Design a protein with these regions (language model features):
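Low-complexity, glycine/proline-biased repetitive segments and flexible coils/loops
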Residues: 2-291
């Protein structure tokens, strides 16, 4: 019986892997998915690591109203959750879903739209929250409004995937919104009319970005899943490294960078807030397994 088991195992041969865009370094192969797909493994089971990044939330849209009098500043979008997988074993067809970013908001006072989840087989990264729209992979930034002197805290991030958004701030004459959380840091809270910056994304997988050409390259370091910036009656704030975009007061905010999971920046009176960035899945495995 043991001899038969050895023979059966040897007939499987080394894993044969398909799917995604293939790149490599001296030690590893990387398969990158920027859209839904399948990681195919035939032969022996494959041992792999992976990062799964969900779609980021869009920034909120503000409004100034004369009757009744209010000035709403909604927050920056939270980054999509970044789920890291290590020493996984897989065979057959493993389904991959790459989440979309939340849609931009246009006109009126509106919280940002949540992104959508990304997944690899049964492993799911949680979508980023829209600005002032609560919890997510990373939380959205909080709201500030005057003359009501009302503000909200930032949304909570998902443990192990992201961070909290920053709080909004308000008095009877100023208001500002918080930055969305990022995979590497919490969003900054707003202070006295100044919007909070989006939280920084994660640079833990910078070497993966260098090989695959993904993430945001900042002076040679690659970041994923940065939060969107907030706005304020005095000033707006920057987005976080990792595809998050800045908040703006009187113009349209830019969309977060595609396939980073970044959060979109908020706007006060521009035509649209920044849409969230779509997600990403990268699978890495050793060359010695397959060559």
């Amino acid at each position: 019986m043991p001899i038969l088991g050895i023979l059966a195992s040897s007939k499987l041969g080394k894993p044969v892997v398909t799917g995604g865009t293939l790149t490599s370094d001296a030690t590893y192969y990387y398969r990158t998915f920027t859209a839904n797909g399948t990681l195919g493994v035939t032969g022996s089971a494959l041992t792999y690591d992976a990062i799964v990044i969900a779609g980021g939330g869009s920034g909120g849209h503000g409004e100034a109203s004369a009757s009744p009098v209010f000035n709403d500043y909604n927050g920056g979008g939270g980054a999509g959750g970044l789920l890291a997988l290590t020493s996984q074993s897989g065979s057959g067809n493993l389904s991959i879903v790459v989440g979309a970013g939340g849609a931009a908001r246009t006109g009126g006072s509106a919280v940002g739209a949540n992104g959508t989840n990304s997944s690899l087989a049964a492993n799911t990264a949680t979508a980023g929250a829209g600005g002032s729209n609560g919890a997510g992979g990373s939380g959205g930034g909080g709201l500030g409004t005057y003359p009501d002197n009302f503000s909200t805290s930032g949304g909570a991030g998902t443990a192990g995937q992201g961070n909290n958004g920053g709080a909004g701030a308000a008095t009877t004459s100023t208001a500002s919104s918080g930055g969305g959380g990022g995979a590497g840091a919490v969003g900054s809270s707003a202070v006295t009319g100044n919007g909070g910056a989006g939280g920084a994304g994660s640079s833990t997988y910078s070497s993966w970005g260098s090989v695959t050409g993904t993430g945001q390259n900042v002076s040679g370091t690659y970041y994923y899943a940065g939060g969107g910036g907030g706005t304020g009656s005095s000033s707006a704030a920057a987005g976080g490294n990792g595809g998050g975009t800045a908040g703006v007061n009187t113009s349209s905010a830019s969309s977060a960078t595609a396939n980073t999971g970044g959060g979109g920046g908020s706007t006060f009176s521009g035509s649209s807030s920044g849409a969230g960035g779509s997600g990403l899945v990268i699978v890495r495995y050793t060359k010695v397994q397959v060559d």
